[in-house]
C-alpha cells in the first residue's frame, strides 16, 4: 500500500489540500525516493522543466534515497539537470546507490550534500544478455561503452583520476557520508538544514 500524506494549507481563499510531493514542489524540492525507471525519470524531468519555467534563476533541490536503476532513465535526469538554467542541489537521505549516487554527484558543485547517516554506493553498470552470440557481443560492447561514459563523467564530477574511478567502481563500493565527501561525490555533510546555507 502506497500512502501519500496530504497537507492542508490555509490561503486567502480558504483551505487547500496538497499531496506532500506537490507541496514540496512549491518550495522547489523534488523527491527521488525509489528505483529509477522511465516513469520516475519522466516525472523528475517534468518537474525540473516546470520549475525552470516558473523561475529560471532560483535553485532546485533534489532529495535522493534511491537504490539506482536504469542507466538510460538516469541519464535523462542527468542531462536535464545539466541542461536547465537553475542550479540543482542534491541531498542524499538514506542511500544513494548506483545511478542514485551518479545523480547525487551530478548536482551543482558546492551544493551536493548528504545527511550524516546516509550511504553512497558506486559500482560499474549491471546488465545481461541472451540470444545469439552476435547479440551478446553487441550488448557487451554497449555496456562497456556505457561504463566508460559513466566513469568519465564521475571522474569529472568528483575530481578523481579516471584510473581511480575505474578501480573503485569495479565492485560495489560503499561510502559513509564523510567518505563520500572526501572522495568528491558530495561537498558537505549536513547535520542541520541551516548548514546548507553556510
From Swiss-Prot:
It is found in: Cytoplasm. One of its GO terms (biological process) is protein quality control for misfolded or incompletely synthesized proteins. It catalyses: Hydrolysis of proteins to small peptides in the presence of ATP and magnesium. alpha-casein is the usual test substrate. In the absence of ATP, only oligopeptides shorter than five residues are hydrolyzed (such as succinyl-Leu-Tyr-|-NHMec, and Leu-Tyr-Leu-|-Tyr-Trp, in which cleavage of the -Tyr-|-Leu- and -Tyr-|-Trp bonds also occurs). Its EC number is 3.4.21.92. GO terms for cellular component: cytoplasm; endopeptidase Clp complex. Its main location: cytoplasm. The active site is at residues 98, 123. InterPro entries: ClpP (IPR001907), ClpP/crotonase-like_dom_sf (IPR029045), ClpP/TepA (IPR023562), ClpP_His_AS (IPR033135). SUPFAM superfamilies: ClpP/crotonase. Cleaves peptides in various proteins in a process that requires ATP hydrolysis. Has a chymotrypsin-like activity. Plays a major role in the degradation of misfolded proteins. ClpXP1 is involved in the complete degradation of the Site-2 clipped anti-sigma-W factor RsiW. This results in the release of SigW and the transcription activation of the genes under the control of the sigma-W factor. This is ATP-dependent Clp protease proteolytic subunit 1. It comes from Bacillus licheniformis (strain ATCC 14580 / DSM 13 / JCM 2505 / CCUG 7422 / NBRC 12200 / NCIMB 9375 / NCTC 10341 / NRRL NRS-1264 / Gibson 46). The gene is clpP1.
